[in-house]
Amino acid sequence: MREISQKDLNLAFGAGETDPNTQLLNDLGNNMAWGAALGAPGGLGSAALGAAGGALQTVGQGLIDHGPVNVPIPVLIGPSWNGSGSGYNSATSSSGSGS
């Protein structure tokens, strides 16, 4: 197997030598400017709302990178007839009517 060089990593992931915070600030400024520019015809309030929307978009996209990738959910989902349900099976449970 071939060893992966730093150049290969940069090409594959676009990592480069830039600071991630610098990229985040560039994206934040760019999205806020677009939001303000698109909201400007509606007045100052719309421009401010557009800039805030651009900021929220950037922050939301940045949070995706820091979230967990695989989170096990402790809820059994599925039909009970194949054993993947919640364990309750109305056909086999007793309702107290006696037998």
UniProtKB/Swiss-Prot annotation:
- GO terms classed as biological process: defense response to bacterium; killing of cells of another organism; monoatomic ion transmembrane transport
> Where do the segments described as Disordered lie?
80-99
- What post-translational modification does the entry describe? The C-terminal Ser is modified by attachment to a siderophore similar to enterobactin, which can bind one atom of iron. The modification consists of an ester linkage of the serine carboxyl to O6 of a glucose which is linked by a C-glycosidic bond to the 5'-benzoyl of a linear triester of N-(2,3-dihydroxybenzoyl)serine. Presence of the siderophore ester increases the antibacterial activity of the protein.
* Signal peptide range: 1-15
Q: Which controlled-vocabulary keywords does the entry list? A: Antibiotic, Antimicrobial, Bacteriocin, Ion channel, Ion transport, Signal, Transport
Domain of life according to the entry: Bacteria
Locate the Serine microcin E492 siderophore ester modifications and list their residues: 99
Tell me its family. Belongs to the class IIa microcin family.
The free-text function statement in the UniProt record for this protein reads: Channel-forming bacteriocin. Forms cation-selective channels. Active on enterobacteria, with highest activity against E.coli. Not active on other Gram-negative bacteria, Gram-positive bacteria or fungi. The unmodified protein is active against E.coli and S.enteritidis. When the siderophore ester is present at Ser-99, antibacterial activity against these species is increased and activity is also detected against E.cloacae and K.pneumoniae. Neutralized by its immunity protein MceB.
- Subunit comment: Multimer. Possibly forms a homodimer or a homotrimer.
Q: What is this protein called?
A: Microcin E492
